[in-house]
């Protein structure tokens, strides 16, 4: 289902855990491709048209089977691409190995890499002197702007996958340091309506269940944040029988949560009630000392935002008299009172630390946006102003049409009479 593997006795440059894992990785990459028909069609076109011929590309993404299919599509389009991980715990080592061995794509990523290694890989990506950066959280672009100003002249543009990354890019633009175009993949309709909501909702609970093997039915789950990721997480938790509480700082989203049937209250009020806490805010220290102090014994905390700062783990470590690993990706922090707080996935993305991330079907649309966003940058080289640009509406609509077609679903089209009515102001009551 994916491009034919490259036969190579001398693998390309890499820093992966174990190349012998490549056969398993290849099987899983091909399996994911079955659920990614839109990206397959784009890859087939790229292979013929080579839109990225002569383009150096650095991708900072979660190294999963779905990302592998994006990387393969970009390479098919002629890109000279390198791939690094966007999170120290999200790499699937068999996938990284397969991309190196079977597809000839340089990969620098290992599950469990420390922060120093992670940043070394970021700099390796920039050593590639990319013309296009695919970013997931804005670490590569931020490093470029802070430390590699001399390379900015090489840049055609960047694409950004996440809410967190878009927040950082907006701050960079306000500060006058974003001097090239950035494509906002996150806010494409075919991305956040599906990836953020259905992908995050399913994969977050998958990660929690894999890490703990708990029954969600009857538990009180506190979801911090009611953006698209929070909506999906709350929806799926309720669907599995949990009693869901939502915490918010935005009054509009709080009203949404109430009218969607959830209890809404401040985190300090929710803290004594919750059995499981899930942060999906993109902000810092959403759960902190005052909340740990009133939580139940055995309360579990997990993060499905981008960075590991939503839960104040540094403070929790200072409060704990002992920390012990009780299961894979599950640590027990024992407080002087004897009460325990259970931290899942080291406070990093639980859906990628303990599970496999979003299902391929939703990532099909997200990565179609990434692929076409990169093509849009190349086609419009030198014509886009510095700053943040949306995915063109026509691209968004085309991705949706291709997805429906692949699902065997047909929809109506406007009649000529309806088109005329929608473009007229003369018809009224």
From Swiss-Prot:
<feature type="binding site">
    <location>
        <begin position="225"/>
        <end position="230"/>
    </location>
    <ligand>
        <name>NAD(+)</name>
    </ligand>
</feature>
<dbReference type="GO" id="GO:0005829">
    <property type="term" value="C:cytosol"/>
</dbReference>
<dbReference type="InterPro" id="IPR000043">
    <property type="entry name" value="Adenosylhomocysteinase-like"/>
</dbReference>
<keyword id="KW-0963">Cytoplasm</keyword>
<feature type="binding site">
    <location>
        <position position="351"/>
    </location>
    <ligand>
        <name>NAD(+)</name>
    </ligand>
</feature>
<feature type="binding site">
    <location>
        <begin position="162"/>
        <end position="164"/>
    </location>
    <ligand>
        <name>NAD(+)</name>
    </ligand>
</feature>
<feature type="binding site">
    <location>
        <position position="191"/>
    </location>
    <ligand>
        <name>substrate</name>
    </ligand>
</feature>
<keyword id="KW-0554">One-carbon metabolism</keyword>
<feature type="binding site">
    <location>
        <position position="136"/>
    </location>
    <ligand>
        <name>substrate</name>
    </ligand>
</feature>
<keyword id="KW-0520">NAD</keyword>
<feature type="binding site">
    <location>
        <position position="161"/>
    </location>
    <ligand>
        <name>substrate</name>
    </ligand>
</feature>
<dbReference type="InterPro" id="IPR036291">
    <property type="entry name" value="NAD(P)-bd_dom_sf"/>
</dbReference>
<dbReference type="GO" id="GO:0004013">
    <property type="term" value="F:adenosylhomocysteinase activity"/>
</dbReference>
<comment type="similarity">
    <text>Belongs to the adenosylhomocysteinase family.</text>
</comment>
<keyword id="KW-0378">Hydrolase</keyword>
<dbReference type="InterPro" id="IPR042172">
    <property type="entry name" value="Adenosylhomocyst_ase-like_sf"/>
</dbReference>
<dbReference type="Pfam" id="PF05221">
    <property type="entry name" value="AdoHcyase"/>
</dbReference>
<feature type="binding site">
    <location>
        <position position="248"/>
    </location>
    <ligand>
        <name>NAD(+)</name>
    </ligand>
</feature>
<comment type="pathway">
    <text>Amino-acid biosynthesis; L-homocysteine biosynthesis; L-homocysteine from S-adenosyl-L-homocysteine: step 1/1.</text>
</comment>
<dbReference type="GO" id="GO:0033353">
    <property type="term" value="P:S-adenosylmethionine cycle"/>
</dbReference>
<feature type="binding site">
    <location>
        <position position="196"/>
    </location>
    <ligand>
        <name>NAD(+)</name>
    </ligand>
</feature>
<dbReference type="Pfam" id="PF00670">
    <property type="entry name" value="AdoHcyase_NAD"/>
</dbReference>
<feature type="binding site">
    <location>
        <position position="283"/>
    </location>
    <ligand>
        <name>NAD(+)</name>
    </ligand>
</feature>
<dbReference type="GO" id="GO:0006730">
    <property type="term" value="P:one-carbon metabolic process"/>
</dbReference>
<dbReference type="GO" id="GO:0071269">
    <property type="term" value="P:L-homocysteine biosynthetic process"/>
</dbReference>
<feature type="binding site">
    <location>
        <position position="64"/>
    </location>
    <ligand>
        <name>substrate</name>
    </ligand>
</feature>
<dbReference type="InterPro" id="IPR015878">
    <property type="entry name" value="Ado_hCys_hydrolase_NAD-bd"/>
</dbReference>
<dbReference type="InterPro" id="IPR020082">
    <property type="entry name" value="S-Ado-L-homoCys_hydrolase_CS"/>
</dbReference>
<feature type="binding site">
    <location>
        <begin position="304"/>
        <end position="306"/>
    </location>
    <ligand>
        <name>NAD(+)</name>
    </ligand>
</feature>
<protein>
    <recommendedName>
        <fullName>Adenosylhomocysteinase</fullName>
        <ecNumber>3.13.2.1</ecNumber>
    </recommendedName>
</protein>
<comment type="function">
    <text>May play a key role in the regulation of the intracellular concentration of adenosylhomocysteine.</text>
</comment>
<feature type="binding site">
    <location>
        <position position="195"/>
    </location>
    <ligand>
        <name>substrate</name>
    </ligand>
</feature>
């Amino acid at each position: 289902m994916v491009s034919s593997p490259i036969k190579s006795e001398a693998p390309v440059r890499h820093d992966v855990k174990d190349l012998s894992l490549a056969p398993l990785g290849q099987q899983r990459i091909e399996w994911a491709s079955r659920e990614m028909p839109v990206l397959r069609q784009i890859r087939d076109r790229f292979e013929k048209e080579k839109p990225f011929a002569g383009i150096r590309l650095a991708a900072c993404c979660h190294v999963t089977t779905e990302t592998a299919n994006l990387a393969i599509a970009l390479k098919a389009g002629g890109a000279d691409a390198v791939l690094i991980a966007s999170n120290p715990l999200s790499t699937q080592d068999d996938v990284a190995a397969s991309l190196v061995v079977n597809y000839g794509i340089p990969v620098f990523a290992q599950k469990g890499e420390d922060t120093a290694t992670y940043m070394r890989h970021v700099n390796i990506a920039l050593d590639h002197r990319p013309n296009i950066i695919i970013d997931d959280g804005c670490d590569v672009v931020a490093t470029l702007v802070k430390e590699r100003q001399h390379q900015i002249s090489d840049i055609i543009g960047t694409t950004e996958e996440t809410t967190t990354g878009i927040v950082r890019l907006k701050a960079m633009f306000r500060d006058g340091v974003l001097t090239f175009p950035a494509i906002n993949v996150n806010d494409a309709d075919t991305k956040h309506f599906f990836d953020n909501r259905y992908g995050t909702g399913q994969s977050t609970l998958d990660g929690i269940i894999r890490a703990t093997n708990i029954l969600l039915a009857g538990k009180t789950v506190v979801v911090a944040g009611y953006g698209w990721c929070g909506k999906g997480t709350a929806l799926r938790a309720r669907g599995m029988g949990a009693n869901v509480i939502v915490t918010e700082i935005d009054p509009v989203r709080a009203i949404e949560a109430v009218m969607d049937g959830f209890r809404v209250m401040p985190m300090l009020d929710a803290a004594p009630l919750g059995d499981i806490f899930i942060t999906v805010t993109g902000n810092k220290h959403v759960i902190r000392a005052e909340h740990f102090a009133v939580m139940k014994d055995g309360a579990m905390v997990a993060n499905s935002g981008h960075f590991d700062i939503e839960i104040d783990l540094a403070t929790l470590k200072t409060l704990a008299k002992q920390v012990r690993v009780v299961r894979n990706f599950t640590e027990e922090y024992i407080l002087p009172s004897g009460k325990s707080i259970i931290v899942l996935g080291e406070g990093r993305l639980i859906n990628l630390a303990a599970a496999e991330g979003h299902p391929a079907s939703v990532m099909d649309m997200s990565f179609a946006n990434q692929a076409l966003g990169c093509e849009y940058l190349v086609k419009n080289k030198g014509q886009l102003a510095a700053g943040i640009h949306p995915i063109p509406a026509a691209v968004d609509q085309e991705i949706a049409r291709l997805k429906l077609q692949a699902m065997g679903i047909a929809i109506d089209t406007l009649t000529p009479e309806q088109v005329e009515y929608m473009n007229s102001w003369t018809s009224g009551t």
